[in-house]
C-alpha cells in the first residue's frame, strides 16, 4: 500500500550550519513523490551524500558512500535514540505513528524553490530531521509540548483545549497507523499510476480560536 505507515527518507547534501530553508539542497539521486494516489512521500530528509560507512573489502574498512541507503540508516539511528530518550523519561516507548509525527513536527524547513511554498512537499517531505528539537519535545512533554497517544473509533473525535502564549508559535501535528487497505490482484501495467486512495482512515486536524 505504497509505504503509508513507513518512514521514507530523502537524501540531501550535508548541512553544517542550518540558517534557513536555503541551507538544504537535495542530491541528484534522491527520488521524490507524490505516491500514485497523491500522498506526500518522502516523509523526512537527512544527509545521504558522502557518508562514512563500513566497507566490505576488509574487516575494518570504511568508505565514503552516497545514496538514500545511506540516509535511511541515519534516520533509523535518530529514531533509536529518541526511543531510548523517551524510555529513560517515561519508562515506555513511543508508538510508531508517534515517532513519525514527532519527526515531522520538529523538522526544519527545506529549500522552498522547488514548489515555491513553505510546508511539506514531495521532495523533502516534512523537512530536514532535527533530532535535538525532537528530543526536547519529549523532555518537555506536558510543559511546553504535548505528545498524546490515543485511539479513535469510526465517527469519533478528540478535542483538546489549550492556551497559546502570546508571541509563541502554536504547531500541531497528527499522525496515525493506517490499517491494510484493499489488495489488488492486477498486473504491474494496470497498477501503474493507480489513483485510487489507499488510506483506510482519513483523519483531519482543525485548530480554532475560541475567543473569536
Question: Which role fits each region the language model picked out?
Answer:
Residues 1-53, 104-107, 171-179:
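Catalytic-core segments of hydrolase enzymes
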Residues 120-201:
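Secreted peptidase-domain scaffold signal
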Residues 4-17, 27, 95-101, 105-134:
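Extracellular hydrolytic enzyme modules, especially secreted metalloproteases
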Residues 18, 90-92, 192-198:
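Short consensus segments that form the blades of beta-propeller domains
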Residues 204-208:
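Beta-strand signatures of extracellular beta-sandwich domains
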Residues 57, 209-211:
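Solvent-exposed strand-loop boundary residues in beta-sheet-rich modules
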Residues 45-114:
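Hydrolase catalytic cores
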Residues 18-20, 60, 113, 182:
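Extracytoplasmic/secreted cell-surface and envelope-processing proteins
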Amino acid at each position: 500500500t505504497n509505504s503509508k505507515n513507513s518512514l521514507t527518507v530523502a537524501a540531501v547534501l550535508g548541512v553544517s550550519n542550518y540558517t534557513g530553508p536555503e541551507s538544504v539542497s537535495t542530491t541528484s539521486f534522491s527520488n521524490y513523490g507524490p505516491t500514485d494516489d497523491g500522498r506526500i512521500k518522502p516523509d523526512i530528509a537527512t544527509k545521504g551524500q558522502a557518508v562514512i560507512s563500513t566497507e566490505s573489502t576488509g574487516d575494518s574498512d570504511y568508505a565514503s558512500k552516497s545514496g538514500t541507503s545511506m540516509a535511511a540508516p541515519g534516520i533509523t539511528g535518530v529514531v533509536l535514540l529518541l526511543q531510548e530518550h523517551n524510555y529513560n523519561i517515561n519508562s515506555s516507548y513511543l508508538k510508531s505513528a508517534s515517532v513519525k509525527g514527532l519527526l515531522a513536527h520538529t523538522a526544519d524547513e527545506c529549500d522552498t524553490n522547488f514548489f515555491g511554498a513553505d510546508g511539506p512537499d514531495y521532495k523533502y517531505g516534512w523537512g530536514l530531521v532535527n533530532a535535538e528539537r525532537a528530543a526536547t519535545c519529549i523532555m518537555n512533554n506536558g510543559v511546553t509540548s504535548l505528545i498524546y497517544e490515543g485511539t479513535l473509533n469510526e465517527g469519533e473525535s478528540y478535542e483538546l483545549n489549550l492556551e497559546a502564549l502570546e508571541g509563541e508559535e502554536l504547531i500541531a501535528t497528527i499522525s496515525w497507523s493506517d490499517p491494510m487497505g484493499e489488495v489488488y490482484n492486477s498486473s504491474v501495467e494496470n497498477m501503474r499510476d493507480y489513483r485510487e486512495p489507499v488510506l483506510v482512515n482519513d483523519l483531519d486536524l482543525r485548530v480554532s480560536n475560541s475567543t473569536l
